[in-house]
Amino acid sequence: MITFLGLYDPVSSWLHLVSALGFLIAGFFLVRKAWGSKLRVAAMMLYTFSLVFLFSMSGTFHLLEYQTAGREVLQVLDHAAIWILIAGTFVPIHTLMFRGPKRWGVLLLVWLITIPGVVLTTVFFSTMPEWLSLSFYLGLGWIGILTAYLVVRQYGKKEARYIFYGGLAYTIGAVMEFLRWPVLVEGIVEAHDFFHVFVILGAGYHWYFVYEHASWPIYKKQIFIVKHNPDRTYFRAHAKGDCLRLESDSLDDLKIKMHKLIEEKYKGKLPIEKVILEFFEEEEVLF
């Protein structure tokens, strides 16, 4: 491998370091779009962490000199981060798109596989064959077939296309890595660099899917806090756990607006089962 500016794997290193910065910035937009629900925001933050952790560990590992302690440590962290990213990608998708067992059951399964996977990869890293570790990663990742099936069944094929694109990109990259093909410029642009390109592409497809759905309502019950002045000539409502706000000069009109808003917000998404209004009367204090 030919070094450049002190980077021992220059293409792979720069690709992933730039991607780490890019996904960190992109995470801000995810959180902003998800704002209003603590669960949504937590899912976006975990997902963003998994992306930044993987690409920063990988980018740093590839810039270090071969057969050094630092490179060996970061290589182990890099492989552990693959598990974290795969599991982390399931979190926002199942949080946003499903409820009940389809949400928590699948996430429990994924993390029950991921945690031992991280431990085994870390402990047996030096003795584990590459084909076995790649098989583990692909096996966990292709639980995404179940995710895609559930999305297709509930929302239609079009809604799941970016999940498929991302999974396909990851798989193509893994096959290239295993076959050590293609080699464009020996010592500079090799199969491993193409692998990184397809990892970025797969992560990008999945990020876009999550972003498209980041503001989806996730609760089956929506509570609105309704405030009004003493003579009931002004009403203002905001939703608990979501960024929904309404104003009106009558309660009946407020309810009509609320019905339209809920209908629009939940159209084609998880159905809402109940809307609850909690009233709060505003009172002026004179000094």
Model-based region annotation:
Residues 1-218:
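Multi-pass alpha-helical transmembrane bundles in non-GPCR membrane proteins
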Residues 3, 180, 250, 254-257:
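Terminal low-complexity, poorly structured segments
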Residues 5-6, 230-232:
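Generic alpha-helix initiation/capping and coil-helix boundary signal
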Residues 95, 124, 244-246, 255:
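Hydrophobic alpha-helical elements and their junctions with loops/disorder across both membrane
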Residues 219-230, 245, 252, 256-287:
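Short, charged, surface-exposed hinge/linker loops at domain edges
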Residues 234-236:
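Short aromatic-glycine-enriched beta-strand elements
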Residues 238-242:
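Short glycine-enriched loop/turn motifs at secondary-structure junctions
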